[in-house]
From Swiss-Prot:
Belongs to the GEM family. It comes from Arabidopsis thaliana (Mouse-ear cress). Residues 95-173 form the GRAM domain. Pfam families: GRAM. This is GEM-like protein 4. SMART domains: GRAM (SM00568). InterPro entries: GEM-like, GRAM, PH-like_dom_sf. The lineage of its organism: Eukaryota, Viridiplantae, Streptophyta, Embryophyta, Tracheophyta.
Length: 222
């Protein structure tokens, strides 16, 4: 769906020295992106953030009008209460994160945010985890897919993006509806992911920016 008048803020990060080979390392996930090793060389200078602003008449990246997914205040409160109850039931964010995704040694979870991931089938509500190694999304509800045996099964939609694979983060908003804000994550291999409908948009962006900066500094020291 085309959207008129979008303002973007771009933050670009140098490619890291070492890069994992896949975006979805969790074997339980039905969608897997296999990515070849990046041919880009790591920059030797200190991390630099390049901020740009641009306005476009529209784009067709599968981003939907947030007015269709924007929850009412009562629905937002219910989502927060429901999430809080689930976190308490499982035993904390760390346990939820480790249940959903593979966690490497020394990996630290920073924050978790509720948002939507844009797909060709429409926005999917879920949880976005930001750690010292990756950003990872898991849908709140399971979806129906065909198994290799031809059966219909229900699985959670998962996307895991190593921080060292992220080339830039585009911070966008609809200039006609400033409350509609988006995060586009572009990888060094040309994949792009659109996140929207955040309950805490700016906090999520700041957390991701900090995680990327720390990740670059760690890779540079290795």
């Amino acid at each position: 769906m085309n959207m008129s008048r979008v303002e973007q803020q771009v933050i670009r990060y140098p490619a890291a020295k070492a890069t994992p080979v896949g975006y979805l390392p969790d074997p339980a996930s039905f969608n897997k992106f296999r990515v070849p090793a990046s041919s880009k060389k790591s920059e030797q200078s200190n991390v630099k953030s390049i901020l740009k602003r641009k306005k476009t008449d529209g784009f067709t990246n599968g981003v939907r009008d947030q007015s269709k997914i924007r929850p009412k205040l009562t629905e937002t409160v219910k989502r927060k209460l429901s999430l809080g109850a689930r976190i308490l039931q499982v035993g904390g964010l760390e346990k939820i994160f480790k249940r959903l995704f593979r966690v490497s040694e020394g990996e630290k979870l920073f924050k978790m945010y509720q948002c939507y991931l844009s797909t060709t089938a429409g926005p999917i509500a879920g949880l976005l985890f930001i750690s010292s190694k990756k950003m990872a999304f898991c849908s709140e509800r399971s979806i129906k897919v065909d198994s290799p045996q031809g059966d219909i099964i229900r699985v959670h939609y998962k996307v895991s993006i190593p921080l060292c694979k992220i080339d830039r983060v585009n911070q966008s908003q609809n200039t006609k509806k400033p409350s509609q804000k988006y995060l586009e994550v572009v990888t060094v291999d040309g994949f792009d992911f659109w996140f929207m409908g955040f309950l805490s948009y700016q906090k999520a962006f700041n957390c991701l920016e900090k995680a990327l900066s720390l990740s670059f500094e760690d890779n540079k020291e290795q």
